[in-house]
Amino acid sequence: MSTFAIPRSVEWRETHVTILNQQKLPSIIEYIDLHTLEDVYEAIATLKVRGAPAIGITAAYGLALAALRYDTESLDEFRRRLKRDRDYLASARPTAVNLFWALDRLVTAAADALSVNEAKTTLVHEAIRIQVEDEDVCRRIGEHALSLFRPGERVMTICNAGSIATARYGTALAPFYLAKEKGIELSVYALETRPVLQGARLTAWELMQAGVDVTLITDNMAAQAIKAKGIGAIIVGADRIAQNGDTANKIGTFGLALLAKSFDIPFYVAAPLSTIDLTTKTGADIPIEERHPDEVTHIAGVRIAPEGVNVYNPAFDVTPNELITAIITEKGIIRGNYNATLPSLFTKEEQHETI
């Protein structure tokens, strides 16, 4: 079965945006229609849509959808409302930089419009372009990543950096889909990824849909699995990469990087250029989202911890650059000296700017 059997995470429908409800997977495949800016915000904030690229795509469509309904012919008023709504959507989640990148790209695209109608058309076209480009970007990331693995290799991953977290293919999971297309055998060991279980619910599900060999383990089995199963490499996605290569990704990623160092196996980060934030100099500058305690104290709505227990629930951690063997982007594989090599990937126009 090809990756194209995996449902798309986001679709533009002219009058609304349709998303795959990732909170209901794997037991229920449910689509939700988002009709308002508030619908889009809520879908992002509550993880109905998740994965840095998919968040960016959804936010871009949400901003374009809102702008289509502005009842003004004044460009100044149009831009004021656009900036207001951009800021509102940007507040949905603080860590994933693709959210801000996509929203700012739309605002910039509409800046030179000579009329409100032209601005509205430009916003829709730019949002669609972001999704189309992301599919190509993910495939190129996958091709580069695939070159790093030997046929038959066993590779570990955490969270879900797959097809449903992007336009298609994913980032960290892209090489496994391409390997399947090319008849190359690779095996994936997927961590369940507490507390929201993206690995168990999403990664295991979508890899199985595509016929990729996947084994699910709990997070605290990682070290034993590396030793007992001969894991040859670890590959993860990213929500934000600082200029020096420090990488924010799902909580537990830092621990995996430490394990990779201990076992002397490579630790790879797979991400598009849009996830690299040159305005963030080091990982210390990356805001770490903390989420509701119920994610830790409940599973599938059932309480598993005592009432009133203290909970610490950071959604992400930051892996220091010295633990990262290479960062895999659509432009190639970058190894070390990230302060110099990451900026060199960008043209001036591609660099992140805060709008």
Curated annotation (Swiss-Prot):
Swiss-Prot/TrEMBL site (Transition state stabilizer) positions: 159
Pfam family, one: IF-2B
Catalytic activity: 5-(methylsulfanyl)-alpha-D-ribose 1-phosphate = 5-(methylsulfanyl)-D-ribulose 1-phosphate
Binding residues annotated for substrate, in chain numbering: 50-52, 93, 198, 249-250
Protein's pathway: Amino-acid biosynthesis; L-methionine biosynthesis via salvage pathway; L-methionine from S-methyl-5-thio-alpha-D-ribose 1-phosphate: step 1/6
Annotated function: Catalyzes the interconversion of methylthioribose-1-phosphate (MTR-1-P) into methylthioribulose-1-phosphate (MTRu-1-P).
Quaternary state and interactors: Homodimer.
Identification of the protein by name: Methylthioribose-1-phosphate isomerase
